Amino acid sequence: MSGLVDAQFPDLARRTVTRYGSGWDHELFCVGGKWIFRFPRRAERVPWLAREIQITAIAAETLGTAVPVFERVGEPCEAFPYLFVGYRLVPGVGADLACARDLAGLAADIGAVLAALHRVDPSRVPPTPDGWEREPWSELRTELAAVADLVRPLLGPDLLAQAEPYLAGRAAEPPQDGPRRFIHNDICPDHLIVDAGTGRLNGLIDFTDAMVGDPALDFAGLIGLGGYRFIDRVVAGYDLPLADGFGAKLEWLSRVLTLTWLAEAAAYDPAGVGKLLSWVIRAFSH
């Protein structure tokens, strides 16, 4: 990838290029220790990335440097067939990797960031390419039931008994009522970048899945950081009203999503099973 970056961004020529990581949708490379370049893994992801260029610019108007703006946009070429982007590295580590974690301070930071994000005018948010905004939560329930056999062998007897109504698709989804806001829609420890020493929030990354939706979706992913007690601390620092029934939504989403993520790990990322299993345990510790 170094030749590709050199050709399109001459000011970065001859900088050291190292692999930074990979996800479901992108390969990431660090250039010169200061820039992260994201390359789509499949053609279907290009419209999402093009949309994310707009999304991050909108979010950065409110959150400033906490959101990495795609300052560099690479064009498709013979060396790489898709649009790609570059942004300044947000210093720090994933929120679950900090050596010293000030959980109270981090919760306050996250609450403030989510409130600011959720205040953005939702009419400014471009629609998702696949129409996710219109999907009912019943689809989450049926998707989990379809992969439940990957999860059942991973759960102890007591946890399995608690999870079975969700795995069997019998735990009905709560109403999708209340205000619809601009949400990140993929809040998790990997996307909350914190100072490695203090554990305080430095930035929020990866707006690929951002959309207009229920704010409860942005709280459910926090289960991986400290369970419901931690989420309560985040809510205390969140100064927007939450709809009646927020607690029921949070519990249902936390359980359905963590079980689904555990199934994905079992299928595609066995090394991540232990971490995701701990999230499931937290989701059912309520």
Can you name each region flagged by the protein language model?
Residues 1-10:
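Juxta-kinase regulatory segment immediately upstream of eukaryotic protein kinase catalytic domains
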Residues 9-10, 62-65, 153-158, 239-244:
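Short helix-capping segments at alpha-helix termini
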Residues 14-139, 149-154:
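ATP-binding pocket architecture of kinase catalytic cores
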Residues 24-31, 37, 70, 167-219:
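Active-site acidic catalytic loop and adjacent metal/ATP-binding pocket
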Residues 63-65, 102-103, 178, 229, ...:
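Membrane-helix interface segments
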Residues 95, 108, 209-286:
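Helix-rich C-terminal or lid/interface subdomains of diverse kinases
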Residues 98, 134, 148-181:
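ATP-dependent phospho-/nucleotidyl transfer catalytic cores
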